[in-house]
Amino acid sequence: GGVINIITRESDDPWNLNLNSRFSEHNDQRYGGTVGFNAGKFNSLTNVQYNNVDTYAVDNPGDFSTVFGSRVWNFKERLIYHPLETLKLTGRAGYYFRERNKPGDTQDRYRGFSGGMKANYTFNIMSNLEVGYTFDQYDKSDYQSLYKNDVRDYSNVQHNVHALYNYTFNGKHTLTVGADYLRDYLMSYQFTDNADHTMHTADAFGQFDWNPTERLNVIAGLRFDYFSDSNVRHLSPHLGMMYKIGNCSLRGSYSQGFRSPTLKEMYMVFNMANMMMIYGNPDLKSETSHNFSVSAEYTKNRYNFSVTGYYNLVHNRINTVYSEDPKGQIYTNTDKMDIAGIDANISAKYPCGLGYRLSYTYIHEFMHDGQKKFTDTRPHTATVSVD
């Protein structure tokens, strides 16, 4: 189990304070507090949490019968400043630390650092602009308690800059354009000699949301992606339509999917618990797909019914396959494959507060002659929930 605190809403109170604690078996202790203030143009919210749990054994014969204890610190701060009625500035920062106890003189340590700045400017009721920068770093290290050495063997550092602009025509048509830049640095024990690699990615996109009538909605978009390490440039279009007839909504869409190989998929050389080796492949191609879908949704009073059908054509899917040279699992591009499926849902909500939902999913992967199946996806899935 875990606790996630997401700071999303500004407080209207001048001051607020929340303190909490929890105790459970295995000496599991959690202490936390949140303090915030709202003073004129400033709004601040600070959250601190500490968690500690002892090592304990579980009734599970075999190699994995012990759950190691740990201690965790988590700090978060968000500060909002309104210098103008039309301008909002947001800053945030966070720090995460976890130390896991295990036998011997070495402890596992995990650290996370995050921060960001964002500006939202409203030109008028028709247009607004958002620009921002975020920083994220996640480290793993081995703490040698006898020598008091903290040896870092994994570090992922990301710098991201983004911009987003919206303009509304005639109060009902919206144009959205934006761009992102990401610098991704990764040093890992999963690379040969703890090597490091850096990749730069950039994208630019545009989308137009057109509403010619109250019944018809059309969304068209185009996205350009660039990845430095694999030197890939790619355009991805998207087109979607919705038409309303009474209580029924009909939808259809086409989109082109795209995914460039990650640094791990290209450069990993990793011994998986002495069971097998996993190797990256710097010659991987980008994974692409063409995705088609149609759906119908009917809503009346407290009842809702929807059905969706889709067909995806996937090219160069990135997966691991067994290799004799080098011996182990290696990332590779698999053969072209097609995937089709149907999703159906029925739900209802009654005045007494009771509701239910029935869902059914069917997936079929079209395999060509001699093609290996790399996934164990269940063709039929059904769920029933009552709340």
Which stretches of residues belong to each language-model region?
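Gram-negative outer-membrane beta-barrel transporters
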Residues: 211-218, 298-299, 306-314, 332-387
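Transmembrane beta-strands of outer-membrane beta-barrel pores
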Residues: 21-25, 39-41, 50-54, 95-99, ...
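Periplasmic-side early beta-strands and strand-to-turn transitions of outer-membrane beta-barrels
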Residues: 5, 12-15, 22, 34-110
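Outer-membrane beta-barrel translocator domains and adjoining extracellular loop/strand segments
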Residues: 56-63, 96, 101-108, 134, ...
